[in-house]
């Protein structure tokens, strides 16, 4: 599955004062694209996934050195996505070039190929080692202003968005849980190091009845960069990190 990524809509950031990153992973940013490290649900698995949640440990990330634009970004996130990758909702943290606040919360959703993604970045500077619950959940209630059902993105218990569409009947099924670190350039570091990994703990899947269960085994691996790695301590507990800095 081609999983699209959350740097596509950054216009709201253009008013920020650009500052150089404190350090750079590699001096040459190399290839631009969708580079992931982590796990995602195999579409062949026959259980229903209506939402995704995990407690994620924030880790800093060094950005590559020769692309001074806000398209130079490193992230870690949870996601619920359509099986064709055209629609998704996600929440996590991000560090992008030029952000004076460093690593911040972010959320994004996209209805599908019809529409642009809607992105929100926080202003709170996040410290390495802090933990937050990032979740996307399907709901049917008054929070859905434009449809019967919608997806809601949360950081801990704070609602960051309720989608303006109902993915039920629109998104290709089965929907997929994803837990990933990501960069837009192969020269950047995915968040986390071997001594301080980005941990995804208490990973959960939202079932058809709206209740939650621990993430099941049988996830597919993403491993786009030989400098990065990921591991697990159980089906519902995973880590990602940059294993080689050069």
Please tell me what each predicted stretch does.
Residues 8-14:
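Hydrophobic helical h-region of N-terminal Sec-dependent signal peptides
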Residues 14-22:
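C-terminal segment of classical bacterial N-terminal signal peptides
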Residues 25-246:
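Exposed, interaction-prone regions of secreted/extracellular proteins
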